[in-house]
Design a protein with these regions (language model features):
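Glycine-rich loop/linker segments at domain edges
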Residues: 91, 161, 241-249, 318-367, ...
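Signature of N-terminal electron-transfer/Fe-S-associated modules in redox systems
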Residues: 1-152, 167
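Flexible, low-hydrophobicity surface segments
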Residues: 139-318
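Short beta-strand elements
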Residues: 46, 170, 174, 366-371, ...
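Extended active-site and interfacial segments that coordinate phosphate-rich ligands
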Residues: 197, 282-289, 295, 384-387, ...
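C-terminal catalytic domains of large/alpha subunits in multi-subunit enzymes
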Residues: 230, 398-403, 433-438, 467, ...
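Thiamine diphosphate
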Residues: 410, 414-435, 439-441, 670-677
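Helix-loop-helix junctions that connect adjacent transmembrane helices in secondary transporters/permeases
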Residues: 308-397, 563-656, 858-872, 877-879
Length: 942
């Protein structure tokens, strides 16, 4: 059959049952993305005869004679469609993976449609932005501008990739047809014909493989290899990645004979197509010895419980207590908490629980691997940590790290989920076995059922205070379900009780925390890295304490938060820390800003699906109860134990600069800020700075993009390299001028020297780039280890309405004040805060990965796992404290993870204010809030 695709004819023969999305991508149309393959997210939206459709559920065989238009067909980076230009200038994206679909849908909207945008765009999801920037794009609002030479800091510069993203031409992980082309900026030739990998998952939560028969699978035409535990390289590792691999337990194998959660790999098939590989998986015959399983962390620690890793040891594998299923624990404090509580004028004691949350990044985990002509293993993969992936792959497979290259193109969302090694190891095993190019791509179901989630926690908080509100005792007792494996199970536990506890002054503190193995799917790194769960509990308890004492919640916090000079104590007041008060302090400003915002008029009530807010005024709307809440959070500007970045800046012919940096870009915005920092130091504009990034060939080392370290670590290193290059430029220019300029009698030559876009001006003379480079290359290197660290602060405020008949909670006002130091790019930072708040609202009100009693995930699609839509999220008002942090680049702090943490308790405190009942469990779904109201009505209380 024949189609017209983006103005060109395409003669194709679809496979039986094939959908339009896969057909287009097979023919090199990579602007069409895979987000769900179920018609839920809109990333694959195209126009068929000018009507927007989800190509992932559109049967290809029905389209003979049709005209198909993708984002690439609407316009190009050089000549964008008006809607594409609007999305670039708003900017209506962060990671950008959803943007092509949004642009295609938006291109069809009339003025009347724009007035009904929440309904018209309900089929398009964005995980990053919080939707305000997308609405700005729809309204033609321009939030970006160009920077003057040397003056990019503080300017809302557009992302370097903006025009490519909106036109669908920016490359993501699998946006290559059969391989990488010769002459591409990767320097790689076209690879061999592509093989695909599919996995057979365990049907049991705990089992041992007695035997496995792969004969029938191997006999299927098109199958090249069937991999089982017999092919495992025999090296234990952790999928969680950190600068020091010793931060995580060695408890995982590429393919294990013992299976510890439903869906764990039993076998992997490498075949000519995904379809053949999946068919072969069904032909693998396995005899399982089913073992007892345990799914509750309390039961897992009881004597006689099934042991998940009882064959491992603390000394060798870094597991705290294998005989108790405990990965790690922390027990300690300052003083006697029981005595302090008994002597307090007021006390609070409560237990808060949080559920599993999916990262729900629209680009799923994916890796393509091959061996290049030089014999190096190359992995093109969706990761936040390319260098850490390289090093662990080399260790597990006994390879020289110099013989492994890891490349991450733009990544379609991370949020911590791509700080894992989930696909790269199997692809490596398959490439080494077959010698061919192999691709492994998670389905959306895999993302829900196999990929790690946020750690569910149970947190008991006990607080004591004097009558004037001064804290006298703080006890946190935290239990964390890390699932079947300990990836991040140590780090998240320790981090969750660090800044959340240290932010308050209190003479007596105690922390009891344990991270526990269960036969549930693994948990992992997630935005906030455990702080969000514990902050929810502590800030809720602080709100209850304020009510107990009759003190305003903001005032209670003012009386108890740390101020410069205070020790930052968790359990040991004498512990040495690299956290420094030399950094800025803006928590006091943030409290004031949110307090003032909540005292002001209510913003326009957002239009949302569901019952109308009716009545003559909101305060009298029938069936609705209204409340106000706030919460605060602190977070260190980067992770502890070191975070390293090595960078370079080089002058190119024509006055352009090229930076080499290992940091991945996945919507975190570091690429934009990196160009701003370098342009400012070198007296040029960001558009003249080229970026070679997230490639293990781009720099000597980079720990990766996690812990909000992209600006404060790699950014600081890049700025130092740019300053060093500036000094080299001026020195060379002075030498050139001095060689042809007679010296004065005194021998002093002291004209003004300025680095400009066209060269270096020495007095009145301009030394151009060509002359500078004629003397040899000009390149500078610098590194930074991320120490010392300072603290960033966020305060969130919320006003909510609770619908008593149904339990629905609507956020009417969302405001967050942030202490981010110097704001390098205001629009980009605003977007990070809005996106973090929107993600947190989702996990506060409805997002939860649910498991049945046997560990089976029951929310395995976007239709059962609700991600906020454009109609769900209020606009978050973002306020900046006026601070300057001398520890960060040009005074900046990190601010990617911080906005997430205070949102849940702020909303929960507002719900408590509205209905008079304390919610203790996240998410606060309609059913749960309704049950609270029903119990109170029936006399059951909260």
């Amino acid at each position: 059959m024949r189609l017209e695709v983006d103005g060109a004819p395409l003669d194709v023969t679809p496979q039986p049952g094939q959908v339009l999305r896969t057909l287009l991508r097979e023919h090199g149309v990579t602007s069409v993305k895979k987000g769900c393959d179920a018609g839920d997210c809109g990333a694959c939206t195209v126009l068929v005869d000018q009507v927007p459709v989800h190509s992932c559920i559109t049967p290809a065989h029905r389209l003979d004679g049709s005209t198909v238009t993708t984002a690439a067909g609407l316009g190009t980076p050089e000549h964008p469609h008006p809607v594409q230009r609007a999305f670039a200038e708003a900017p209506g994206f962060q990671c950008g993976f959803c943007t092509a679909g949004f642009v295609v849908t938006a291109s069809t909207l009339t003025e009347d449609d724009l007035a009904d945008r929440h309904r018209k765009l309900k089929g398009n999801l964005c995980r990053c932005t919080g939707y305000r920037a997308i609405e700005d794009a729809l309204d033609g609002v321009v939030n970006t501008t160009c920077a003057a030479p040397g003056a990019a800091i503080g300017t809302s510069v557009a992302a370097p990739a903006a025009r490519r993203i909106v036109s669908g031409s920016e490359e993501y992980t699998l946006d290559v047809p059969d391989g990488l082309l010769s002459g591409s900026d990767d320097g790689l030739r076209r690879t061999q014909a592509l093989l695909h990998l599919a996995v057979l998952g365990s049907p049991h939560p705990h089992a041992r493989i007695r035997s496995i028969d792969t004969v029938a699978a191997e006999a299927l035409p098109g199958v090249h290899a069937v991999l089982t535990y017999r092919d495992d390289p025999g090296v234990l590792f952790s999928t969680g990645r950190h600068e020091s691999r010793l931060d995580d337990p060695d408890d995982t194998r590429v393919l294990d004979r013992v299976l510890r959660f439903r869906g764990q790999r039993v076998a992997a098939v490498v075949a000519d197509s995904v379809r053949i590989a999946e068919q072969a998986c069904a032909l693998v015959h396995v005899d399982y010895e089913v073992l007892d399983s345990v799914h509750d962390p309390d039961a897992a620690r009881r004597p006689g419980a099934p042991l998940l890793h009882g064959d491992k040891t603390t000394a060798e594998h870094r597991i705290g207590e294998p005989a108790r299923n405990v990965v790690a624990s922390l027990h300690g404090g300052t003083g006697d908490v029981e005595t302090a509580l008994s002597a307090s004028a007021a006390t609070v004691d409560g237990v808060w629980t949080t559920g599993r949350v999916s990262h729900a990044a629209l680009e799923t985990h994916a890796t393509r691997g091959w061996v290049d002509p030089d014999g190096r293993l190359v992995l093109r993969t969706a990761t936040q940590v390319p260098f850490l992936v390289r090093d662990e792959i080399a260790r597990v497979f006994s390879l020289d790290p110099a013989g492994v290259r890891v490349v991450a193109k733009r990544v379609g969302g991370g949020f911590g989920g791509k700080q894992e090694l989930l696909t790269e190891d199997l692809v490596t095993l398959a490439v080494l076995r077959t010698g061919r190019t192999v691709q492994f791509e998670f389905s959306r179901r895999d993302e829900f059922t196999v990929a790690p989630t946020r750690h569910p926690m149970r947190v008991r908080v006990r607080l004591g205070a004097d009558a004037d509100g001064t804290l006298t005792a703080l006890h946190v007792d935290q239990t964390m379900d890390t699932g079947a494996y300990g990836n991040h199970g140590i780090g998240v536990m320790f981090h969750s009780v660090s800044e959340s506890v240290a932010v308050y002054r209190c003479p007596v503190k105690r922390v009891d925390a344990e991270s526990v193995y269960t036969n549930n799917l693994p948990s992992g790194a997630f935005r906030g890295y455990g702080l969000g769960q514990v902050v929810f509990a502590i800030e809720s308890a602080m709100d209850d304490l304020a009510r107990e004492l009759g003190i305003d919640p903001v005032e209670l916090r003012r009386r108890n938060v740390v101020v410069p000079g205070d020790p930052l104590v968790v359990t040991d007041p004498h512990e040495q820390s690299d956290l420094r008060w030399e950094g800025s302090y803006g928590l006091d400003q943030c409290l004031d800003l949110v307090e003032d915002a909540l005292a002001g008029p209510l913003p326009e009530v957002p239009r949302m699906d569901g019952p109308e807010l009716s009545g003559p005024g909101l305060d009298h709307a029938a069936d609705w109860a209204f409340g106000t809440g706030m919460a605060l959070a602190a977070i260190a500007t980067m992770p502890p134990r070191g975070h390293h970045a090595h960078t370079s800046v080089e002058l190119l012919p024509g006055g352009r600069y090229r930076i080499g940096v290992g940091t991945a870009e996945f919507g975190n915005g570091t690429t934009t800020v990196h160009t701003q920092l370098v342009a400012t130091a070198l007296g040029t504009t960001p558009d003249r700075v080229d970026v070679h990034q997230s490639d293990t060939d781009a720099a000597r080392h980079d720990t990766g993009a996690f812990g909000s370290a992209g600006v404060v670590v790699a950014g600081r290193a890049l700025y130092a390299a740019a300053q060093a290059l500036r000094d080299d430029l001026t020195a060379r220019a002075l030498a050139l001028v001095a060689a042809r300029t007679p010296r004065t009698a005194s021998g002093v030559l002291g004209p003004a020297v300025v680095v400009e876009p066209e060269g270096v001006r020495v007095g009145a003379e301009l030394v151009g780039h060509a002359e500078l480079l004629a003397e040899g290359p000009l390149i500078a290197h610098a590194s930074h280890d991320g120490t010392p660290r300072s603290l960033a602060f966020t305060v969130h405020g919320a006003r909510v309405a609770v619908h008593r008949p149904t339990g629905e909670v609507r956020v009417l006002q969302s405001v967050q004040a942030v202490d981010a130091g110097t704001v390098l790019n205001p629009e980009q930072l605003r977007g990070q805060v809005e996106g973090g708040a929107a993600q947190a609202i989702g996990s506060t009100l409805y997002e939860e990965v649910l498991l049945d009693a046997t560990g089976r995930v029951t929310t395995d699609a976007f239709r059962s796992y609700r991600v906020p839509k454009i109609s769900d999220v209020p606009r978050t008002q973002v306020l900046f404290a006026d601070t300057h942090d001398p520890l960060g680049p040009l005074g900046a702090k990190s601010m990617s993870e911080a906005p997430y943490n205070p949102v849940a308790p702020a909303v929960a405190n507002a719900v408590r204010d509205a209905i008079g009942i304390r919610p203790y469990r996240l998410p606060m779904t309609r059913d749960r809030v309704w049950a609270l109201l029903a119990d109170a009505t029936d006399g059951g209380g909260a």
